[in-house]
Amino acid sequence: MAKADYNKRKPRKFGKGARRCIRCGQYGPIIRIQGLMLCRHCFREVAPKLGFRKYE
């Protein structure tokens, strides 16, 4: 095997590295409600525009 073969990675199918935020590209805490695919930071910024309300 050549050295170039070691640098290729197969795409992840599960885990934190499998999904990324469609707004900022961050991996990690992803909100997938109704297919949003937003990280929690972006979700907090965009949630009122999407119609989500915060109840006390």
Swiss-Prot record:
GO cellular component labels: cytosolic small ribosomal subunit
Residues engaged in binding Zn(2+): 21, 24, 39, 42
Pfam family membership, one: Ribosomal_S14
Entry keyword set: Metal-binding, Ribonucleoprotein, Ribosomal protein, RNA-binding, rRNA-binding, Zinc
Textual note on the cofactor: Binds 1 zinc ion per subunit.
InterPro entries: Ribosomal_uS14, Ribosomal_uS14_arc, Ribosomal_uS14_CS, RIbosomal_uS14_euk_arc, Ribosomal_uS14_sf
Cofactor names: Zn(2+)
GO biological process, one term: cytoplasmic translation
Molecular function per GO: rRNA binding; structural constituent of ribosome; zinc ion binding
Membership in a protein family: Belongs to the universal ribosomal protein uS14 family. Zinc-binding uS14 subfamily.
Subunit: Part of the 30S ribosomal subunit.
Name recorded for this polypeptide: Small ribosomal subunit protein uS14
Species for this entry: Pyrococcus furiosus (strain ATCC 43587 / DSM 3638 / JCM 8422 / Vc1)
Gene: rps14
